[in-house]
Amino acid sequence: MSRYLHTLLKAIDLQVRSGLANPEIKNLSTDSREIEKGDLFLGLDGEKVDGGTFWAKAIERGACAAIISKKASLLNPPTNEDPVVILPEPVSLFMGKLAADFWGKPSSEICLIGITGTNGKTTTSFLIEFLTTSLGHPSALFGTLINRWPNYEETSKYTTTFAVPLQAKLRKAVQAGVEYGAMEVSSHALSQNRVAGCDFNGAIFTNLSRDHLDYHDSMESYFEAKASLFRSHLIDDDGPRSVINIDDKWGSILAKELNKKCWTCSLKENSQIREKPDLYISNLQIMQDGYMGKLHTPFGVGNFISPLIGEFNLMNMLQAIGILVQRGLPLNDLLEALNKFPGVPGRMQLINMDGFKVKDGYPLVIVDYAHTPDGLQNALIASRSLTKKRLICVFGCGGDRDKGKRSKMGEVAAKFADYIVVTSDNPRQEDPIEIIKDIQKGITIDSEISVEPERSIAIQFAIAKAKKNDVVLIAGKGHEDYQILKDQTIYFDDREQARKALSLRTDVI
């Protein structure tokens, strides 16, 4: 795809200065080192370095023009003869809309659904992709684990891709025949305008609990970032285009603001916002391998069987089906497909369950991505429902991240687990022992606890210690296959470590 510079500038409401050339643009690039001939260089403003200062190197490498911020132009001033456009504000504010226009506004050609919240985004997005595909609608998935569409799949580097590659991926998905798209939308992405230029047909608010307070100043700031998906990026019309979890305090606030532009959903039949939630569950029965019950929507009621474990997954299921019913898909067809959902890697993943049974004498081992206090609590409660004896929890906290949540996660583990093994997660530049000390501040003195900074040894210890009918929950990393130690990233997979520990174990009955 190609466009001309002047056309793109007008698309973001910028006047074209006199004498500026109007070259044909072959592609967009934010990295001066990866420029190819005919590319338009976009000088992205970074936390430490303003990429716009490298405009001259981009031109040398073949860029037909560069767009930079005023700040970058002061650090490395261009002349009037240079093919450089100077923006009054950071380039990131314009990048999403510019990229969307360059790629022909691909999101407007599909039903794009955004999912935001602290926990539940990945499972909900996987559900949406699976259900729409099962009903014969080719779908795309953009999120924490993978980006994929028909005949293409790649491992994700970010929960939400940056604006320029995101629009390119959307165009490729449209070219592959996609009708629906499920996109995880992080608070970082919303704060950094990565989804500017995306037209969302629908949006889901899963929940909000403590996370990323190293980036956001407060829970209020964190909420404002999440809420911007519903205020600024949804297609604006009179009908409801969102589904909001009102069992969550912040969700209730958002639902009251959106009013009739949203459907409320709750695991309770009564609502403080409306007489009844728009989406809710009744006649719930817990089974060994999931749940069954009735799902209520404004468009009808249907019986469901869900293979997902944990009450929090009932909310994920309710929201995924709710948004698709809201967008016009038939409820009964969605509920029929639900029973075949294969689950999500690293999300309440049962490592050694075979035909709903665990080898005699062995514990059940579960790997989950839970890395926030709320997420850990949900995973522990779900794991408790599967154990007949002790619940053992292995977890740590990431380094160079929100330190305030560490003691809270220790407090949660002490409250809901019978035995705790505190270990490392991704310590990054911090000392693992110091992180563990922060976690221990929230753990009561009478708790049964072991400390082992080496994560592989901690997993092996917990599984060796567990007995028949115990459950071992390994929390924090889920699908991740790496560990970050100082400046080194090593291969590490909790699921592989768990299987190895199980194979080394002698029967303890």
UniProtKB/Swiss-Prot annotation:
Q: Name one GO cellular component term.
A: cytoplasm
Recorded E.C. number(s)? Answer: 6.3.2.13
Q: What is this protein called?
A: UDP-N-acetylmuramoyl-L-alanyl-D-glutamate--2,6-diaminopimelate ligase
- What's the catalysed reaction? UDP-N-acetyl-alpha-D-muramoyl-L-alanyl-D-glutamate + meso-2,6-diaminopimelate + ATP = UDP-N-acetyl-alpha-D-muramoyl-L-alanyl-gamma-D-glutamyl-meso-2,6-diaminopimelate + ADP + phosphate + H(+)
What is the role of this chain?
A: Catalyzes the addition of meso-diaminopimelic acid to the nucleotide precursor UDP-N-acetylmuramoyl-L-alanyl-D-glutamate (UMAG) in the biosynthesis of bacterial cell-wall peptidoglycan.
Q: Residues that bind meso-2,6-diaminopimelate, according to the entry?
A: R401, D425, N426, P427, R428, G476, E480
Q: Which NCBIfam families match?
A: murE, PRK00139.1-2, PRK00139.1-4
Predominantly, its location class is cytoplasm
Task: Tell me what PTMs the record reports for this protein.
Answer: Carboxylation is probably crucial for Mg(2+) binding and, consequently, for the gamma-phosphate positioning of ATP.
- Name of the top EC class for this enzyme: ligase
Q: Which residues bind ATP?
A: G117, T118, N119, G120, K121, T122, T123
Q: In which pathway does it act?
A: Cell wall biogenesis; peptidoglycan biosynthesis
Q: Where in the cell is it found?
A: Cytoplasm
Indicate where the modification N6-carboxylysine is found in the sequence.
Answer: K226
What terms describe the molecular function in GO for this protein? ATP binding; magnesium ion binding; UDP-N-acetylmuramoylalanyl-D-glutamate-2,6-diaminopimelate ligase activity
A Pfam family it matches: Mur_ligase_C
**Its family?**
Belongs to the MurCDEF family. MurE subfamily.
Name the residues that bind UDP-N-acetyl-alpha-D-muramoyl-L-alanyl-D-glutamate.
Answer: S32, T159, T160, S186, Q192, R194
Question: Where is the motif (Meso-diaminopimelate recognition motif)?
Answer: 425-428
